[in-house]
Design a protein with these regions (language model features):
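Conserved ATP-binding subdomain of kinase catalytic cores across diverse folds
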Residues: 4-20, 24-180, 191, 195-196, ...
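Hydrophobic/aromatic side chains embedded in well-ordered alpha-helices
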Residues: 91, 198, 203-205
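Catalytic activation segment of kinase domains across protein kinase-like and atypical kinase folds
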Residues: 123, 129, 202-207, 211-241
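Short, contiguous, pocket-lining structural segments
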Residues: 159, 181-192, 202, 206-207
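Intrinsically disordered, compositionally biased low-complexity regions
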Residues: 178-179, 186, 199, 233
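Internal nucleotide-binding/catalytic subdomain
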Residues: 187, 195, 239-241
Length: 241
């Protein structure tokens, strides 16, 4: 599945064989240097000092008239943060995230978006063997609260400052010259996250794993693992257990 409307808006023009090659992880766009991102995170109240992209790689950035976007593959194979995982994804969750993220976009909710969903032709071992897939997604950024936590928990404060400077330049350049721009960054991130969760609640969306490793600095919805929509209002409903 190739999201041609999104590709057009990003100025991406590829032949069919290039789509299959690049977005399956079998080939790389010119000048691409893939990286897996490192981060920590509070998961359901417990701090985990080392997480990172276990099955995702960032291919690079796309500059458009509307700003800069990350281009990321999910399910393309092992990274240095895979731990005991295989770095792969089953095709079902890939298609599910494709549909959900596009639905959220058209519902007016800030979100990562799906550019392509590719069947790999391989099988991945889960409870049973399932068809494998790779998702290509874009987002304004994959910087997470957990990215800051990784360095802060190690007292690497110069790295925290560098990360904050990058986040300001990328997402909030209008605050660069303010006297307390780091405090203003915190306020902007908190405000955008509050607005995001409010939009979720307005449409009955439950993320299911809203931990700091899934909390973007840009205020976008990412990682559609156990998420669901409420069919009927039930304030105690959960989808993460």
């Amino acid at each position: 599945i190739f999201n041609e409307d999104l590709a057009d808006s990003l100025g991406i023009k590829l032949k069919d064989e290039e789509v299959s090659n690049f977005f399956s992880g079998n080939g790389l766009p010119k000048d691409s240097v893939p990286i897996a991102l490192n981060y920590a995170g509070h998961q359901f109240g417990n701090f985990v000092q080392q997480l990172g992209d276990g099955r995702a790689v960032l291919l690079g950035e796309i500059n458009t008239k509307d700003g800069t976007y990350d281009l990321q593959l999910k399910g393309s194979g092992k990274t240095m943060f895979s731990r005991q995982g295989d770095g792969r994804s089953a095709l079902g969750p890939v298609i599910r995230e494709y549909i959900l993220s596009e639905a959220m976009h058209y519902l007016g909710v800030p979100t990562s978006r799906a550019l392509a969903a590719i069947a790999t032709g391989e099988h991945v071992a889960r409870e049973t063997f399932e068809p494998g897939g790779v998702l290509t997604r874009i987002a304004k950024s994959h910087l997470r609260v957990g990215t800051f936590e990784y360095f802060a928990s190690r007292q690497q404060l110069n790295d925290v400052k560098m990360l904050a400077d990058f986040a300001i330049q990328r997402h909030y350049p209008e605050i660069r010259e303010t006297e307390k721009h780091y405090l203003e960054l915190l306020k902007r991130v908190a405000s955008n996250q509050s607005k995001l969760v409010s939009k979720w609640m307005s449409i009955g969306f439950i993320h299911g794993v809203m931990n700091t490793d899934n909390f973007t600095i840009s205020g976008e919805t990412i990682d559609y693992g156990p998420c669901a929509f409420l069919d009927e209002y039930h304030p105690g409903k959960v989808f993460s257990s």
